[in-house]
Amino acid sequence: MTLDYPVPFHTPNLVWDYTIAIYLFLLGISSGAVQLAIAYKRSNKLENLSQNWIIRSGVILGSVPTLIGLTLLIFHLTRPWTFWKLMFNYQFNSVMSMGVMLFQIYMLFLVIWGVVIFKKEIEALINRFIPKLQFVMKLIGIAERIVSPVEVILFILAAVLGAYTGFLLSALISYPMLNNPVLPALFLASGTSSGIAATFLIILIAGKLKGDSHESHFIHKFEVPIMVTELGLIVCFFVGLHFGGGQKTVALHNALSGFWGVVFWVGVLIIGILIPLIANMFVNDRLKYNRNFIILVSIFDLIGVFCLRFFILYAGQLTVA
């Protein structure tokens, strides 16, 4: 049955609300930023890792959004004070529980990677404030010897985390639009895009790097391919719904009409994909590597990914099987 009334944020079939949408958005940023930072580190011979802003961004964006996302997830529980049960009592038939385990392993490897990168800074702090913790430096020394395989595993975990955000929604089998095999790949691509955009904002605003810096040139290599991939996956997503027939076709109609249709066409497609894509493909290099221009395009990219998360979550729950 098609909908003939506006239900932007309220529907009888709503199970997950805006908290989950923000949670998915934050995890995507974490996934993309960490993958980018590791790719940059392994592609360049860097003498002082802790002073490089792409590496710094990877550590910051890898950890902070994930911790904020987990906090949101905890307060989304019916009984938040029982969160420790979710953290340490795994249910292998629960996608959410498996996700929590993934986050814990991901954060463990991220911490190992981060302390190796900031080894000198940690040592200086220990010597100055807590000399009794000198044994920590021995542990970091051990971690330093295995940092290469740790990086490889962390990169894989970051990619799995990005795809997991799609698996989480596709597990809702009673919703035809969400029960879609394209979602994990789409969320991985869009999450990587948001991680790139967030990294750009940090290196240009906090790091005060120039728009034509080596770091900016490196990041630009990935922008267009990822956005084209994201656009292609969105097309595949909707084509699958269209030819799926039955409630899948109804779900497509409901999603692309009304309030959430506007969110998709304007927020996701125009602001989030077409404008950044055109800006990267057709403007001259002087504008393309302009600091303010990159910041503006990155903000558009983040808005688009944010809208995509809300669109998929809310529009996907408009129609049941």
Swiss-Prot record:
Alphabetized InterPro entries for the sequence: Electron_transfer_protein, NrfD, NrfD-like
Keywords for the protein's UniProt record, in alphabetical order: Cell inner membrane, Cell membrane, Membrane, Transmembrane, Transmembrane helix
Presence of keyword Metal-binding: no
Subcellular location per the Swiss-Prot or TrEMBL entry: Cell inner membrane
GO CC annotation terms, alphabetical: plasma membrane
Membrane topology qualifier: Multi-pass membrane protein
Transmembrane segments: 20-40, 58-78, 98-118, 153-173, 185-205, 224-244, 259-279, 293-313
Main localisation: membrane
The keyword Lipoprotein is assigned to this record: no
Protein family per UniProt: Belongs to the NrfD family.
PANTHER family in alphabetical order: PROTEIN NRFD
Function: Probably involved in the transfer of electrons from the quinone pool to the type-c cytochromes.
Protein name: Protein NrfD homolog
Organism, as annotated: Haemophilus influenzae (strain ATCC 51907 / DSM 11121 / KW20 / Rd)
